[in-house]
A protein has these predicted regions:
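A polyanion-binding, active-site-adjacent surface
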Residues: 2-195, 199
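C-terminal capping/extension of enzyme domains
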Residues: 1-15, 28, 170-190, 199, ...
Length: 253
């Protein structure tokens, strides 16, 4: 099968979203769903090296934890999502706890495929601090540009596609609901087929339940707690390696 270019991948997803917007009566400009208090939460993140990655990894957390564009009452497309994930040079913390977990999980999955990821994992493992976020902050100045940009090899999406209009807090639990369960699930399944990943990592306790991934045998599927979940220890580096000891099952703390 011919490998898709990044632009082809984006175009196929864009076409899929246009159809979804029509079916759900979503305003293309704002993302607001007609006659509701809900707005489309945004396009998925696609790293610029995803299609050429030695192993294609797709992360699927439950929902967007922070509605970045609530003040503008609109949503991120592909470029906006990239900018949102890219670390700010003057930021006190490199990543928020969720993206820190995403980054460290990416490094773990790629460390047998890329020398840059292997060395990066060693830096993180030796760094001071208990949480993944702290270890990344303490290692960041030692990393080269390739290591800092390892998220460019992966993609991530959300299972739940809508946020409440005007929501200005980070907790995403309120928006783990469906407007049209069948259409939203079909959208996610179609996205997975277009992404055609080698590995899918579902994040959150209900991330994989009842998802009915088509042609599951094509993928290696893992699931884990949300990477910022303190109660499960998911915010620690040693939790990440445990994820991959057990497919489709949660690692123990």
């Amino acid at each position: 099968m011919e490998t898709k270019t990044l632009e082809t991948l984006k175009q196929e997803l864009d076409n899929l979203f246009h159809k979804f917007f029509e079916d759900m009566k979503i305003d293309e400009k704002t993302g607001i769903v007609k006659d509701t208090n809900k707005r489309f939460s945004g396009y998925p993140y696609i790293g610029e090296k995803y299609v050429e990655a030695p192993v294609k990894i797709l992360f699927i957390p439950l929902d967007t934890g922070s509605d970045e564009l609530y003040k503008d009452n609109t949503y991120h497309k592909f470029d906006g999502r990239i900018k949102q994930i890219t670390p700010k040079k003057d930021a006190k913390h490199v990543f928020n706890p969720h993206i820190a977990g995403l980054y460290a999980t990416t490094v773990c999955l790629l460390k047998e495929k890329l020398d840059s990821a292997k060395e990066c994992w060693e830096y993180l493992d030796k760094a001071g601090g208990k949480t993944t976020s702290t270890k990344i902050n303490n290692s960041w100045k030692k990393l080269n540009e390739e290591q800092k940009n390892l998220l460019s090899y992966v993609a991530y999406d959300n299972r739940y596609k809508f946020v409440t209009i005007g929501r200005n807090y980070k907790s995403g639990g309120k928006d783990r609901t469906w407007l049209n369960k069948d259409k939203e699930r079909e959208l996610l399944l179609s996205e997975i087929e277009i992404f055609n990943p080698d590995i899918i990592v579902f994040q959150g306790k209900t991330g994989l339940d009842n998802c009915n991934v088509k042609n599951k045998e094509k993928y290696t599927i893992f699931k884990a707690n949300h990477p910022s979940h303190y109660g499960s220890g998911a915010n620690k580096l040693d939790y990440i390696e445990k994820i991959f000891d057990k497919k489709e099952g949660f690692p123990k703390k």
